[in-house]
């Protein structure tokens, strides 16, 4: 028990700065949403359309680079830190290639908008203009992910936390200056929102490089007379391919997840207004909670990667069990809090009786799946440390799209099982998906430990 308590302390020590970094980055979107709420309706609609296209594409790129965390932590654990710089340099090359592809796709966003929906021509033009400005923030965002993943892989999550908090404050100033009507010299509206993203993401990357400049471990230099400085920075296609091969299933998993929730939101959009609002409130609360297990998962992945690289296999089961204990305690606490204080939470958003009644049901489902959600997200982090990323995609795709979504669809929109339930039916589908995913992931971890 003593060794588990020690490991829980170590995991929490890594989790807290990761959580603060994640919450600060998420808060940027929330603050921008509040600021654009005061713009003209066409501007708000244009940004909403733009974000719905930008989010899944940039998260796909983000997922491709997540392979760097377990890669760096394993090398760090093995003691061969002279191999880390070549991984980082090639991760920047991979980020550059991903950026180019994403920027080309986003530049042609007019094709995507025409394909997925019929948008008002004025809103469509404003959306395209917004996306074509926003796309220039892509390299800055992905380069920041490279250095953040490097720091986390080296058990140094604090730089990302510091820059995340500074970036949040900087974002408030820049966004307010460019978006607000009070500054008549700017007042760029939706265009200002795109320019703000460019400035903030590039600022965060440059600031991150600056504050880690004097860290010997992060900026470790290879001293090899047989390798020239030029060769050191040229792309190594084998390393790039290995990072891509490992990151691709993670990226697909993230893409599957976000597109599922996007599709559910689109299907609910045709229902009564109170159902749409209730769904958005419940989704907002659930998405905020999601950052907690994600932070624990990253911490577990880092610790496991380090000891797998060190070949200290006796520590593996302790780390896995300790991360799951943390998940169990926190998820139970959150579920209890939601059940006890659901009314107070909902009334922060609305006072409408119909919305409160439906949101209450959705939050009770949210409380029901917290334990399963924590186990499956932390389990994903554990599997990433084993570099077992293909199975993550298979489990995510199966549980969400083959099990959860059809079940939710039949409950929400058809009379085949019960009389159609509306939006709440999709939430039962999410519950079934998360139960399925957590069982499959825990079974996979059990198999890996046996090996």
Curated annotation (Swiss-Prot):
One of its GO terms (cellular component) is plasma membrane. GO terms for biological process: monoatomic ion transport. One of its GO terms (molecular function) is antiporter activity. Signal peptide: none annotated. It is a multi-pass membrane protein. Keywords: Antiport, Cell membrane, Ion transport, Membrane, Transmembrane, Transmembrane helix, Transport. The chain crosses the membrane at residues 44-66, 92-109, 130-147, 162-179, 186-208, 247-269, 282-304, 319-341, 391-413, 423-445. NCBIfam families: matE (TIGR00797). Multidrug efflux pump. This is Probable multidrug resistance protein NorM. The lineage of its organism: Bacteria, Pseudomonadati, Pseudomonadota, Gammaproteobacteria, Enterobacterales.
């Amino acid at each position: 028990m003593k060794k588990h308590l020690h490991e829980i302390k170590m995991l929490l020590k890594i989790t807290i700065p990761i959580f603060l970094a994640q919450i600060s980055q998420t808060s940027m979107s929330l603050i921008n949403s509040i600021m654009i709420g005061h713009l003209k309706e066409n501007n708000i609609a244009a940004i909403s359309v733009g974000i719905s296209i930008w989010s899944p594409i940039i998260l796909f790129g983000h997922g491709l680079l997540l392979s760097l965390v377990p890669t760096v932590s394993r090398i760090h654990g093995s003691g061969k830190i002279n191999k880390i710089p070549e991984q980082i340099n090639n991760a920047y090359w991979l980020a550059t290639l991903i950026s180019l592809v994403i920027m080309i796709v986003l530049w042609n966003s007019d094709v995507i908008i025409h394909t997925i929906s019929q948008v008002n021509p004025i809103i469509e033009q404003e959306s395209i203009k917004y996306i074509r400005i926003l796309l220039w923030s892509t390299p800055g965002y992905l380069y920041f992910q490279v250095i953040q993943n490097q720091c986390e892989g080296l058990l140094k999550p604090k730089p990302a936390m510091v820059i995340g908090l500074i970036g949040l404050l900087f974002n408030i100033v820049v966004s307010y200056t460019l978006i607000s009507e009070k500054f008549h010299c700017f007042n760029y509206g939706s265009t200002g929102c795109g320019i703000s993203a460019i400035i903030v993401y590039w600022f965060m990357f440059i600031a991150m490089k600056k504050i880690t400049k004097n860290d010997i471990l992060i900026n470790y230099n290879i001293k090899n007379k047989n390798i020239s400085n030029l060769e050191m920075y040229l792309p190594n296609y084998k390393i790039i391919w290995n990072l891509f091969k490992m990151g691709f299933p993670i990226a697909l998993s993230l893409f599957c997840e976000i597109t599922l929730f996007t599709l559910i939101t689109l299907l609910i959009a045709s229902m009564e207004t109170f159902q749409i609002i209730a769904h958005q409130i419940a989704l907002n609360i659930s998405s905020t909670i999601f950052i907690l297990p994600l932070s624990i998962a990253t911490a577990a992945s880092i610790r496991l990667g380090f000891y797998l690289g060190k070949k200290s296999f006796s520590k593996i089961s302790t780390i896995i069990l300790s991360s799951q204990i943390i998940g169990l305690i926190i998820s139970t606490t959150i579920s209890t809090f939601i059940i006890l204080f659901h009314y107070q939470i909902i009334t922060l958003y609305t006072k409408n009786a119909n919305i409160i009644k439906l949101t209450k049901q959705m939050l009770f489902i949210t409380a029901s799946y917290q334990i399963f959600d924590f186990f499956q997200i932390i389990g994903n982090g554990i599997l990433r440390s084993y570099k077992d990323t293909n199975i993550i995609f298979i489990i995510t795709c199966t549980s969400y799209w083959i099990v959860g979504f059809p079940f939710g669809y039949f409950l929400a929109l058809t009379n085949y099982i019960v009389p159609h339930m509306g939006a709440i039916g999709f939430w039962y589908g999410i519950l079934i998906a998360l139960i399925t995913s957590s069982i499959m992931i825990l079974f996979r971890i059990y198999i890996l430990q046996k090996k």
